[in-house]
Regions:
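N-terminal leader/signal peptides at the extreme start of proteins
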Residues: 1-21
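Conserved hydrophobic/amphipathic alpha-helical signal-anchor segments
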Residues: 2, 14, 46-92
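N-terminal single-pass transmembrane signal-anchor helix
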Residues: 15-47
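Hydrophobic alpha-helical segments
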Residues: 17, 31-34, 53, 107, ...
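Periplasmic/extracellular, small/polar-rich flexible segments of pilin-like filament-forming proteins
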Residues: 72-167
Length: 167
């Protein structure tokens, strides 16, 4: 009787060793992976939008510096990006334009083309010249998150008219 019991016990242990996961175990693993993916995906998409904004911020900064150089040589601000010869990104996410008000300021805009889908915000930069002190000042502004695609308008150094000052 004892040998029969040993045989049944060993055969039962062998079956368990050869068996795979139960359906419940597999479902629990799938649910855990789904929850982790649901948490990580929005964070990942937010990082992609931030990377695209970083490219626009760099271009606006380059346009601000180019405006300073152009003004130093010509005595006036440039009216378009082609004159400044700053290589702009390919234009899939932002449209870059220069809006010159007068000989004391130049506003450069980076308008988000598809801000809702891309997770990007419009930006603008301002280059200001003070003829009294003969000094330049610059600012880079970013629109609020979830706002429309219109770039903020800088009102002077460190003034973005209610939008976020990022430089």
């Amino acid at each position: 009787m004892a040998s029969n019991f040993k045989f049944k016990l060993l055969s039962q242990l062998k079956k368990r060793a050869e068996g795979g996961f139960t359906l419940i175990e597999l479902l629990v693993v799938v649910i855990i992976i789904g929850v982790l993916a649901a948490i990580a995906l929005p964070n990942l998409l937010g990082q992609v939008g931030k990377a695209r904004e970083s490219e626009a911020k760099s271009t606006i900064g380059a346009l601000n510096r180019a405006q300073q150089g152009y003004f130093t040589e010509k005595g006036t601000f440039a009216t378009d990006t082609e004159t400044l010869e700053v290589p702009a990104p390919d234009g899939n996410f932002f449209s870059f334009a220069v809006n010159t008000a007068d000989n004391t300021e130049a506003i450069q805009d980076a308008t988000a083309l598809n801000w809702e889908a891309d997770g990007t915000r419009s930006m603008s930069g301002g280059t200001f010249y003070d003829s009294g002190t003969r000094a330049f000042s610059t600012v880079v502004c970013r629109a609020e998150a979830g706002s429309e695609d219109t770039p903020p308008t800088p009102g002077g150094a460190n003034d973005c008219g209610g939008a976020e000052v990022i430089k």
